C-alpha cells in the first residue's frame, strides 16, 4: 500500500472521528473493522498517526485558527477541511515531510471529498503555514 493510500485512509479516519466528536481508541478500532489492509503494520501506522494528531489537536487547531482571515471562525470550517488541515499540518510540522508533496496530496483529497472551494481554501491556509514556519522543500 503506497503512502498516498495510507494518507487517504488516515484522512477518512480523522474525518470520521471529527463527525462523531469522539477520539476514543474504541472508535479508532471500529473504523478498521470494515477495511481490508495489506498488513497489520499499515493499520498500526495509521493508528499511530491519528493518535499523534489527536495528542496535538489543540496546537493544530490553534495553527488553523491563526491562519484564518480575521472574519472567519474555526467553527465555520467543514469537518472535511478540518481533518485535511490537521493531517497536512501534522505531516509538515511534526513529521517534517516535504511540504510540496503533502500539500499536493491533501489538495487532491480536498477536490475528491470536499466542497468546490475546499482545495483553494486548504491550499491558501497551508501556503501561509509554510511561509510562517519557514519550511524548506
Language-model segments: what does each one mean?
Residues 1-119, 123-137:
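N-terminal interaction/assembly modules
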